[in-house]
Amino acid sequence: MAYFLEQTDSEIFELIFEEYKRQNEHLEMIASENYTFPSVMEAMGSILTNKYAEGYPNKRYYGGCEVVDKIESLAIERAKKLFNCQFANVQAHSGSQANNAVYHALLKPYDKILGMDLSCGGHLTHGAKVSLTGKHYQSFSYGVNLDGYIDYEEALKIAQSVKPEIIVCGFSAYPREIDFKKFREIADEVGALLLGDIAHVAGLVVTNEHAHPFPHCHVVSSTTHKTLRGPRGGIILTNDEEIAAKIDKAIFPGTQGGPLMHVIAAKAVGFKENLKPEFKAYAKLVKSNMQVLAKALKEKNHKLVSGGTSNHLLLMDFLDKPYSGKDADIALGNAGITVNKNTIPGETRSPFVTSGIRIGSAALSARGMGAKEFEIIGNKISDILNDINNVSLQLHVKEELKAMANQFPVYQQPIF
């Protein structure tokens, strides 16, 4: 197949092929990454990238938006059907942009946010001091108990003490389900709004493999990639008409200018894929594969945060190990397994070193790997960690896993 890019920029073309080779030969186990649908990539590479469309369908500031109005309207309707809600904004460029737009819509400067502590699994946009949310608003955090589960009683006490305007329930590294009903009870107790950030578990939510944030949350944000397997982007959902109007204004003109119409089209394509029966089977596989992996690691006496997992990810705990999350990340990377170092509850090391790693099952499940492969992977992870400085072992495992990976090709071509 001939590519224009090969003729116009051979350097980038060759690097894309290099990454294509890496994605095919390595085991991608970063919990926030996934392999999107080829149809999604086709939409993203379309002529829609040429069109500016500031505003919303039938309320644009530019002409020539007749077609993109239809595309965005289709994306909105599919999102509403997928998440069973009344209002959807599909313009957010990312999950962080979606969260910031929610705050911009519903809060005043220096209002109070209560979100999950970063070391317990929260996200930067849930009030971390280094984030805009930690600078523009007063941020407070709740955490987990000694068992690694969210401490709802502590969260209630903190909420009663600080009286936040908004409570955020969601995570980037928490291996258990969120109890949205309990969080709503806490929010109602203190008169707060409830934002459900389901960026990580959206694909499980829409297939009934995780509790649904509605009707408990006033507003819901998510990314469209991760477990949804759509394009990189964000969405905001609600059943409240007044909140929906504020959200729309907060996205445009509040925090963004022109929407990315090629990405919005890709979101629509992804939502259609998510509505298919095959996607339900995929979500079940994501969860069952993670259970197999957790079991394999526990049988080898590896410590997991909360003792296991109820979703698509797990956290390994190295607090009592001589090696760090960074060490494990590097060693596993050398063996062809891509994970990420991650802070964990009770963290004693810096965020650049950490005492844990986060592992996800979404990407390898998308390749069609199942219980057999995940048991093998669990055993190989254990072998590497138990002899973490053995470089020759790492290289040997890399070749073994490369052979397995080649049985489950990601794509037939790198550019769509």
UniProtKB/Swiss-Prot annotation:
It catalyses: (6R)-5,10-methylene-5,6,7,8-tetrahydrofolate + glycine + H2O = (6S)-5,6,7,8-tetrahydrofolate + L-serine. It is found in: Cytoplasm. It comes from the Bacteria. The record marks 225 as: Plays an important role in substrate specificity. It holds the Pfam family SHMT. GO terms for molecular function: glycine hydroxymethyltransferase activity; pyridoxal phosphate binding. Its cofactor is pyridoxal 5'-phosphate. Belongs to the SHMT family. Catalyzes the reversible interconversion of serine and glycine with tetrahydrofolate (THF) serving as the one-carbon carrier. This reaction serves as the major source of one-carbon groups required for the biosynthesis of purines, thymidylate, methionine, and other important biomolecules. Also exhibits THF-independent aldolase activity toward beta-hydroxyamino acids, producing glycine and aldehydes, via a retro-aldol mechanism. This is Serine hydroxymethyltransferase.
